[in-house]
């Protein structure tokens, strides 16, 4: 493939943007090489500035569950733009969005719109601290909840790509308020609560880890955390920025049958626009300003154009059979990847929950952060580039989940698997 224009743009970008990008994982630091620059997207495809086409399994990191540039979403945005870009005042679409989220996710009796997943998680933790009068939180190794200071302790996503356990600039006194657990460690969770449970405001967790690749919870693990939180008076926060409306219509909490106190959302509820939200029990949400004393605000929160895009996307995922078809397509891809790797003599396993999946270069079933980071990263990186050269774009990090969309039909998946068979053969050489 020719990448001359992308190469020139990246060289220019590096003089203007830190690392040449506006989010670290986009720089290909983990896999090596240089990123391509996208000119447009449609359905399951990205098209770069050098006119190369890629089958896309990143999906803008999750929002594009119905494929890129879906006509219903695009038309909703065009209609909204005709009425103005931002009002700085309430609009009807905000109410409709709140009605939709509270109907689809019953644990959210009230919601507050924000502009990103990071804002949502920061706001949810502030609410938990204010409501409980406690300061400590518990998170999990490899779980990423945005770039808030409290979360950059044994974080996933770009923090794993950079190979550092936390970030400079986070005060030690603040990070000391964040305790960490190993995901899927039942005994460790019980022991930590026995030690500090009376000080814990909240447990925040990705119910399916999506930022140390894709790691599902073991049977009963989320319920175990629910029980511990209830016993010790802590709140349970599900970070469903990634899993919300993707692994099931009601998110991971519906899929696993566990009810959190607070939930954070993003990605799909924006339909590709910058949107986040947090919601939960009415008695908690009524403590948020101006109804209560716990402050949170945002100039562009509830933006009418973003609400229009998100509502259109949420209409699409409510179509009968949407999530069943999405899960079946993801299973077809994962099974095909494992078969292709096996035929090449390469150890690969996959994890899948609904329309999320993970590819691990190992013989073992991956159930923890430690197992994810012990996989053969060199082989993954070679596979990534071999697939990219064949027009298939996987997440440019071994520590990121993959995302299926409803635009990935059987022909697209078969083309992906044909490329994978060749790519695995390259890796095996």
UniProtKB/Swiss-Prot annotation:
The keyword Cytoplasm applies. One of its GO terms (molecular function) is transaminase activity. It comes from the Bacteria. The modification N6-(pyridoxal phosphate)lysine is found at residue 267. It is an enzyme of class 5 (isomerase). Pfam families: Aminotran_3. One of its GO terms (cellular component) is cytoplasm. Pathway: Porphyrin-containing compound metabolism; protoporphyrin-IX biosynthesis; 5-aminolevulinate from L-glutamyl-tRNA(Glu): step 2/2. PANTHER family: GLUTAMATE-1-SEMIALDEHYDE 2,1-AMINOMUTASE, GLUTAMATE-1-SEMIALDEHYDE 2,1-AMINOMUTASE 1, CHLOROPLASTIC-RELATED. Belongs to the class-III pyridoxal-phosphate-dependent aminotransferase family. HemL subfamily. This is Glutamate-1-semialdehyde 2,1-aminomutase. The gene is hemL.
